[in-house]
Amino acid sequence: MGVLLTQRTLLSLVLALLFPSMASMAAIGSCSKEYRVLLGQLQKQTDLMQDTSRLLDPYIRIQGLDVPKLREHCRERPGAFPSEETLRGLGRRGFLQTLNATLGCVLHRLADLEQRLPKAQDLERSGLNIEDLEKLQMARPNILGLRNNIYCMAQLLDNSDTAEPTKAGRGASQPPTPTPASDAFQRKLEGCRFLHGYHRFMHSVGRVFSKWGESPNRSRRHSPHQALRKGVRRTRPSRKGKRLMTRGQLPR
């Protein structure tokens, strides 16, 4: 019993180091002990956060960027966020660590963006929708809720008897460091690019979660390399000697 208690104590310390701000939040709230319930919550939260109507679109309208030529510049900078391929290549624990670290950087960047947003009274005078500002202000509480569930899932996985080999996460690729801008307009564009990348990242996160198994001991592997090997095994030469046509390829 003493050995088991010591192992659990060490586990709690490790989780607190990996998810420092989440440990206190989980103490206030409660972690679900049901893996499927917790996974379902994570999937719903990521579905919510990849929706551009909740963050990027309101930001574009408030900042006066809702013009086709300006929208073209709202594209994620390459390497700003971890790619889907990188996320799929991680073990589940490494994936959760990377997700948690990246969201921590996102929270800092959102705080910076909020400071540069116009006030509610200024929006009213400009005839803009105050609801857009309210949506932007809800982004940070939503991320905190997601990080709480990430901590709970990490705790649940480490309490299970899963023997999945863990690949170390690379952590956040430091998405959100604002580049020096010469004027306010450039800062608006930087914020727009950041939010575009954030939504893309959350879409990738949702796709990874969708490949997780129905129990903490079973996970449908989300590695693209295994999917490639399966595709090779399923490929059969045509009996009529015709060339195989890959999906999406138009006939000549």
UniProtKB/Swiss-Prot annotation:
Residues of the propeptide: 222-252
Pfam family, one: LIF_OSM
Transmembrane intervals: none
PTM notes: Propeptide processing is not important for receptor binding activity but may be important growth-inhibitory activity.
Stored Gene3D superfamilies: 1.20.1250.10
Residues annotated as signal peptide: 1-25
InterPro entries: 4_helix_cytokine-like_core, Leukemia_IF/oncostatin, Leukemia_IF/oncostatin_CS, OSM
Listed Basic residues bias regions: 218-245
A GO CC term assigned to this protein in UniProt: extracellular region
GO biological process: immune response; negative regulation of cell population proliferation; negative regulation of hormone secretion; oncostatin-M-mediated signaling pathway; positive regulation of acute inflammatory response; positive regulation of cell division; positive regulation of cell population proliferation; positive regulation of inflammatory response
One GO molecular-function entry: oncostatin-M receptor binding
Disulfide bonding pattern of the chain: C31-C152, C74-C192
Compartments where found: Secreted
Primary subcellular site in the record, as a coarse category: secreted
Glycan-bearing residues: N100, N217
Region of interest (Disordered), ranges: 162-184, 213-252
Keywords: Cleavage on pair of basic residues, Cytokine, Disulfide bond, Glycoprotein, Growth regulation, Mitogen, Secreted, Signal
Family to which this protein belongs: Belongs to the LIF/OSM family.
Function per UniProt: Growth regulator. Inhibits the proliferation of a number of tumor cell lines. Stimulates proliferation of AIDS-KS cells. It regulates cytokine production, including IL-6, G-CSF and GM-CSF from endothelial cells. Uses both type I OSM receptor (heterodimers composed of LIFR and IL6ST) and type II OSM receptor (heterodimers composed of OSMR and IL6ST). Involved in the maturation of fetal hepatocytes, thereby promoting liver development and regeneration.
The protein, known as: Oncostatin-M
Taxonomic source organism: Homo sapiens (Human)
Lineage: Eukaryota, Metazoa, Chordata, Craniata, Vertebrata
